[in-house]
Amino acid sequence: MPYATNQNVRIHYQVEGEGLPLVLQHGFSNSLDTWYERGYVDPLKHDYRLILIDARGHGASDKPHDPEAYALQLRAGDIVAVLDQLHIAHAHFFGYSMGGWIGFGLAQYAPERFPALRTQHGASAAGLTEGPHAGEGSLCGRLRGAVWGFDAAAKSPRARQ
């Protein structure tokens, strides 16, 4: 199995086909196998050199225990590390869900490497303060409060009726 390394984290990837390089990045709790299972690889590999990547924490890639190891800039760096190992200067990108979020990171941290970038159902990182210590005023803090509030409301006796 091929791996690239970014800051001591091994990132698993696979390459299929020939043609223009196209990175496919899966969503949260999936792996690169998702692209095979959903039938994307066979029709696309005739026109593209598909670079399928297991995001850090997923599939056969390393799973660091430190929450800071999952910062958007590091995740974008993982994609760049794979491309560098393959000696690919520019690639198109498609990511969905968490993969779409990683795509926003590529647009921010490595725009010169991606002439075309497409995301589906990815959350924009605009206004997001990352990390476990995001303040209540940040988007992350407000979302956390909303989720915790929903959870508490769902556990109330009235909500269970």
Where on the chain are the PLM-derived regions?
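Short, hydrophobic/aromatic-rich segments at coil-to-beta transitions
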Residues: M1-Y3
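Conserved HGGG/HGGXW glycine-rich cap/lid loop of the alpha/beta-hydrolase fold
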Residues: Q7-K63
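Glycine-rich, phosphate-binding/catalytic loops in enzymes
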Residues: R38-P43, P67-Y70, A110-P111, A134-E136
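Helix-rich cap/lid subdomain of alpha/beta-hydrolase
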Residues: L117-Q161
